[in-house]
Amino acid sequence: MLKMKTGLQRAFLAVIVAVGTLWRMTLVAQDAASLYKAKCAACHGADGKGDTPVGKKLGLRDFSSPEVQKMSDAELTTIIADGKEKMPSYKKSLKPEQIKDLTAYIRDLGSKK
């Protein structure tokens, strides 16, 4: 009986940990989507195609383009943090973790053709 109780406790704990992890991942994805909408979508578009009026004027690349997709996460993170050409720097207004989350979100947008 004691072994069964201990096994159930372990299973319950595993479920709690799994649910907590999924919840955190969902929050991170929602936060990244909100950040992208607030900081990036005006130029890059909601879908990362760069086809907004501003994006067209600046000649922004589609996130699914080979040029963007071949960039490493470190390169994308650096561009978000430091800016590039007409793109502003976000290292003073975003936390490193937020920049990392944006990189993952942009990578995900780019994988959707």
Residue ranges and their predicted role:
Residues 79-80, 91-113:
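C-terminal capping alpha-helices of c-type cytochrome domains
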Residues 33-59, 84-86, 108-113:
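Periplasmic/extracellular electron-transfer cofactor-ligation site
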Residues 1-28, 108-113:
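Post-cleavage N-terminal segment of exported redox proteins
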Residues 30, 70, 93-97:
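Soluble non-cytosolic domains of exported or imported proteins
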